[in-house]
Swiss-Prot record:
SUPFAM superfamilies: 6-phosphogluconate dehydrogenase C-terminal domain-like, NAD(P)-binding Rossmann-fold domains. GO terms for molecular function: ketol-acid reductoisomerase activity; magnesium ion binding. The lineage of its organism: Bacteria, Pseudomonadati, Pseudomonadota, Gammaproteobacteria, Enterobacterales. It comes from Escherichia coli O1:K1 / APEC. GO terms for biological process: isoleucine biosynthetic process; L-valine biosynthetic process. This is Ketol-acid reductoisomerase (NADP(+)). Residues 209-344, 345-484 form the KARI C-terminal knotted domain.
Length: 491
């Protein structure tokens, strides 16, 4: 199989990379009705599989789970989760032939085997659904021409998909139809109904393409969402300890600092995050972020280039074929780092303390978010897609570190994201070591003293922060979410 993106000509590549439209609430007036009375069979019962299934069932759809024979016979975790939640469970042979929509929610590396198993069993004219387009775009999976291929990609972990639905809301979602597989022209109707059934239409849906979703998703998770947080955690911890900070305090400042800092990001973008700092600290954070952007820009561009060309995917798939040797080695090495093995700090750190003593961390967040966004947009990805794959998801990933450090982040994210994270962080840590050696007192671990600032400089920095394109599109999209939540909660 050939990488699908690389089979397209340049005009087709640009058209698919640039496909992104924020859909109006009125486009979902029919809710999930297009799929009501039809049989939806989900393959895989992990975080996305279970939680999407729960939402879809609560939205009135007929949901069952197709699992491998051995998973059922051995009563594995997937079987237990599905049966304990009252779902019908059967083998591929028992359930797939009757399915109107088969939703493949297994890990990326299993997709080819799953499709190879289910495709011969699918009835003529059925639909195949994904929540990530890697198998179609990067692997180049060929699907029977009578089958409609759609994607519904919630921009959150599966647990959040469920919790937001239970609150009467949803999570922002990308939907797409594979242009090579829409024989009856019903792909968009299926995708809209599926998105509505998960609650995504209440938070905002972007009509996208398989290509745009995959390329932007890979870029976000490799750089700012996971790679930058891992590299930043390791670098900042080592710097604090090197300067005499108690390792337990240093660990807590970083572990919970990312979550605290990005909560401000979630509520009001980079502008609010920077506004949490004193004026002298804001000026310093801005200066540090500009230095970081200059240093890291080539690394971000290399990751984007390798994602666009397919170099990243081919390297990762070679590691799949080698029993994940690189992935497992990197995972083990990360678990042995000083940050991961540091003792826990029993004392309390106040919320503002995380900002005051984390100026460098704030600079890293700002630089990483802006660089990821800029690099995606420069590559033809539309701003709304770039926002969701950079700033929007960052607080969710930071929350995983707050639970159990980098271990938890790497457990929760996909193997694809984890592999890309290690590629980035292993390059970024040595790249930034000279920069770390030049830090000033107050950049990390100590607060910058209050003092006079130049009004004109502060004015210009504030303007630069607020006028960045990600702040403009972020304000618009957060406004949509707030408005939609208000409408949804009001009934």
């Amino acid at each position: 199989m050939a990488n699908y993106f690389n089979t397209l000509n340049l005009r087709q590549q640009l058209a698919q990379l640039g496909k992104c439209r924020f859909m109006g609430r009125d486009e979902f007036a029919d809710g999930a009705s297009y799929l009501q009375g039809k049989k939806v069979v989900i393959v895989g019962c992990g975080a996305q599989g279970l939680n999407q299934g729960l939402n879809m069932r609560d939205s009135g759809l007929d949901i069952s789970y197709a699992l491998r024979k051995e998973a059922i016979a051995e009563k594995r975790a997937s079987w237990r989760k599905a049966t304990e939640n009252g779902f019908k469970v059967g083998t591929y042979e028992e359930l797939i032939p009757q399915a109107d929509l088969v939703v493949n929610l297994t890990p990326d590396k299993q997709h080819s085997d799953v499709v190879r198993s289910v495709q011969p069993l699918m009835k003529d004219g059925a639909a195949l659904g994904y929540s990530h387009g890697f198998n179609i775009v990067e692997v180049g999976e060929q699907i029977r021409k009578d089958i409609t291929v759609v994607m519904v990609a919630p921009k959150c972990p599966g647990t959040e998909v469920r919790e937001e639905y239970k609150r009467g809301f949803g999570v922002p979602t990308l939907i797409a139809v594979h242009p090579e597989n829409d024989p009856k022209g019903e792909g968009m109707a299926i995708a809209k109904a599926w998105a509505a059934a998960t609650g995504g239409h209440r938070a905002g849906v972007l009509e996208s393409s398989f290509v745009a979703e995959v390329k932007s998703d890979l870029m976000g998770e490799q750089t700012i969402l996971c790679g930058m947080l891992q590299a930043g955690s390791l670098l900042c911890f080592d710097k604090l300890v090197e300067e005499g900070t108690d390792p337990a305090y240093a660990e807590k400042l970083i572990q919970f600092g990312w979550e605290t800092i990005t909560e401000a990001l979630k509520q009001g973008g980079i502008t609010l995050m920077m506004d949490r700092l004193s004026n002298p600290a804001k000026l310093r954070a801005y200066a540090l972020s500009e230095q970081l952007k200059e240093i890291m820009a080539p690394l971000f561009q290399k990751h984007m280039d390798d994602i666009i060309s397919g170099e990243f995917s081919s390297g990762m798939m070679a590691d799949w074929a080698n029993d994940d040797k690189k992935l497992l080695t990197w995972r083990e090495e990360t678990g042995k780092t000083a940050f991961e093995t540091a003792p826990q700090y029993e004392g309390k750190i106040g919320e503002q303390e995380y900002f005051d003593k984390g100026v460098l961390m704030i600079a890293m967040v700002k630089a990483g978010v802006e660089l990821a966004f800029e690099t995606m947009v420069d590559s033809g990805i539309i701003e709304e897609s770039a926002y969701y794959e950079s700033l929007h998801e960052l607080p969710l990933i930071a929350n995983t570190i707050a639970r159990k450090r980098l271990y938890e982040m790497n457990v929760v994210i996909s193997d694809t994201a984890e592999y890309g994270n290690y590629l980035f962080s292993y390059a970024c840590v040595p790249l930034l070591k000279p920069f770390m050696a030049e830090l000033q007192p107050g950049d990390l671990g100590k607060a910058i003293p209050e003092g006079a600032v130049d009004n004109a400089q502060l004015r210009d920095v504030n303007e630069a922060i607020r006028s960045h394109a990600i702040e403009q599109v972020g304000k618009k999209l957060r406004g949509y979410m707030t408005d939609m939540k208000r409408i949804a909660v009001a009934g």
